[in-house]
């Protein structure tokens, strides 16, 4: 994985701006083959620099920008403040899971510096990282709706936050599943190079954790995505093993009429009394990137205090009468989709 990233960055360096050739000037009959590729046989012209070669340089540019954004985020006041917010939540969450090796509060109090793991070598130079040791409690991560990070600085910063979070929690990148229906082929290849697992199907947020403690990272996603996620894990056992970093549920309650929330997003409406929420800090540098973002977790004590009737209702959401859905449906499952 590190070799692939290094190769991509070599391409980026090789693609430094050059003087444009006059349109009236005829191109050379043969060009040198790109590194790692055979030259065209004699008597046949080599193909001009095509999309694949351009992609190689473009992926290097994206990787370099991610690396630069990561360095800026890592030294920012926002990162340290947001990390403290996540710390407070995960401390309680992992204590609830009865992690065998100490508590997360002890772990945060004994941070140590280490070098980046090999899979995150996105550039030749590196900066020290604080690594968390979470004992035998192995977390997984799912990321929905990160956006077009190759072209959007907001999405790129949200991705770099995810990468730092994975590193901090010692979640292997291969144990982080990522999906956005708007990903370009370039972005999918970059994510593969970074080592995360790109999902091939639009789950619409309907992913069961299957008993595995999981952090869901889904910033600025459509409300239906959160509602679907809750439906897919609608039990005390499953919800108590989940952490959701995403749109503030309190904010949703304040913005939406109660009848709209209960009708269109019933699982969000029913879980409001069964969760705890900590808001992300707000700084001017990252105001537009992490606004309206909170960390949510589900204490067992609160979940068990909810009415039994709440757990018996498990009808799958369909949103047929919901306006302004704000998510892209899976066409194979969407009854309104046409061939």
From Swiss-Prot:
Residues 30-47 have a biased composition (Basic and acidic residues). Induction: Up-regulated by hemin and 5-aminolevulinic acid. Residues 30-50 are annotated as: 3 X 7 AA tandem repeats of R-E-A-A-P-R-G. The keyword ATP-binding does not apply. Residues 1-54 are annotated as: Disordered. Residues 1-16 have a biased composition (Low complexity). Keywords: Biological rhythms, Cytoplasm, Heme biosynthesis, Repeat. It is found in: Cytoplasm. It comes from the Eukaryota. Residues 17-29 have a biased composition (Basic residues). Pfam families: SRR1 (PF07985). Sequence repeats lie at residues 30-36, 37-43, 44-50. Belongs to the SRR1 family. This is SRR1-like protein. It comes from Homo sapiens (Human). The lineage of its organism: Eukaryota, Metazoa, Chordata, Craniata, Vertebrata. The gene is SRRD.
């Amino acid at each position: 994985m590190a070799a692939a990233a290094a190769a991509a960055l070599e391409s980026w360096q090789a693609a430094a701006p050059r003087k444009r050739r006059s349109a009236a000037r005829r191109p050379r009959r043969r060009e040198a083959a790109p590194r790692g590729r055979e030259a065209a046989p004699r008597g046949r012209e080599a193909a001009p620099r095509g999309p694949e070669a351009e992609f190689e340089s473009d992926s290097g540019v994206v990787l370099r920008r991610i690396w630069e954004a990561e360095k800026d985020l890592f030294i920012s006041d926002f990162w340290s403040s947001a990390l403290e917010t996540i710390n407070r939540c995960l401390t309680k969450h992992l204590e609830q899971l009865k992690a065998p090796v100490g508590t997360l509060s002890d772990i945060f109090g004994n941070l140590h510096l280490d070098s980046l793991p090999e899979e995150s070598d996105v550039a030749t130079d590196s900066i020290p990282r604080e690594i968390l040791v979470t004992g035998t409690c192995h977390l997984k991560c799912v990321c929905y709706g990160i956006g077009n990070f190759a072209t959007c600085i907001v999405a790129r910063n949200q991705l770099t936050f995810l990468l730092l979070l994975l590193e901090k929690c010692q979640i292997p990148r291969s144990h982080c599943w990522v999906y956005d229906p708007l990903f370009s082929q370039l972005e999918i290849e970059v994510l593969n190079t970074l080592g995360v697992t790109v999902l091939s199907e639009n789950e619409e947020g309907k992913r069961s954790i299957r008993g595995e403690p999981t952090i869901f990272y889904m910033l600025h996603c459509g409300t239906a995505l959160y509602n679907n996620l809750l439906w897919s894990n609608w039990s005390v056992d499953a919800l108590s093993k989940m952490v959701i970093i995403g749109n503030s549920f309190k904010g949703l309650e304040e913005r939406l009429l109660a009848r709209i929330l209960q009708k269109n997003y019933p699982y969000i409406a029913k879980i409001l009394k069964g969760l705890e929420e900590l808001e992300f800090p707000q700084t001017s540098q990252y105001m537009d990137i992490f606004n309206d973002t909170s960390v949510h977790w589900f204490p067992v004590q609160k979940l068990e205090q909810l009415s039994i009737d709440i757990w018996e209702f498990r009808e799958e959401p369909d949103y047929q009468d919901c306006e302004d859905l704000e998510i892209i449906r899976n066409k194979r499952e969407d009854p309104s989709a046409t061939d």
